[in-house]
From Swiss-Prot:
Coiled coil start-end: none
Protein name stated in the entry: Small ribosomal subunit protein uS4
Subunit structure: Part of the 30S ribosomal subunit. Contacts protein S5. The interaction surface between S4 and S5 is involved in control of translational fidelity.
Record's keyword annotation contains DNA-binding: no
Pfam families per UniProt: Ribosomal_S4, S4
Gene it is expressed from: rpsD
CDD domains linked to this entry: S4
Amino acid sequence: MARNLDPKCRQCRREGEKLFLKGEKCFTDKCAIERRNYAPGQHGQKSGRLSDYGVQLREKQKLRRIYGVLERQFRNGYELAERQRGVTGENLLQLLECRLDTVSYRMGFGASRSEARQIVRHNGILVNGRRINIPSYQVKPGDVIEVAEKAKNHLRIKASVEAAEQRHFPEWLEVDTKAMKGTFKNKPERSDLPSSINESLVIELYSK
């Protein structure tokens, strides 16, 4: 299966902001953005002015990297969002937030989205009591997400849940940290998601 093998800290520096790709490290002063807040490479500190197309492309790449999806998956998500009722950009963000790997990450079952994705692929997550090993599976309001019994004793998962609890869970999730189980109450509203994401630039890029 195709994967993005670029170093995660390098991806954050390329976008000029924290994408939270490396779990707990991103919340410490060891984060690469804290130490070298400029683009990687020989000319990283001499960033030139981007064209309108360049700005749109950078925003798309940033969004793809945040959610860890490849171009084909992202394009398919845009096309689905465009067919749905409502605002296309908000629909796209909701589709990304409803992915099983993202929901598992938000519930603290993985320190990062990539770690949560790996746990899903290894049959470590149940949805309504059924094993689902497809990271892109779309979680629906009312679905119950739970760490599989065999994975509940993994120290990394325990540590991730504890750290997520300290940072507080999103309003659209209800999580029982002791049972390692949570309910996806509803899809997040646009106001619930980071304002640093400008999804309208992505829609402008794809609609050309």
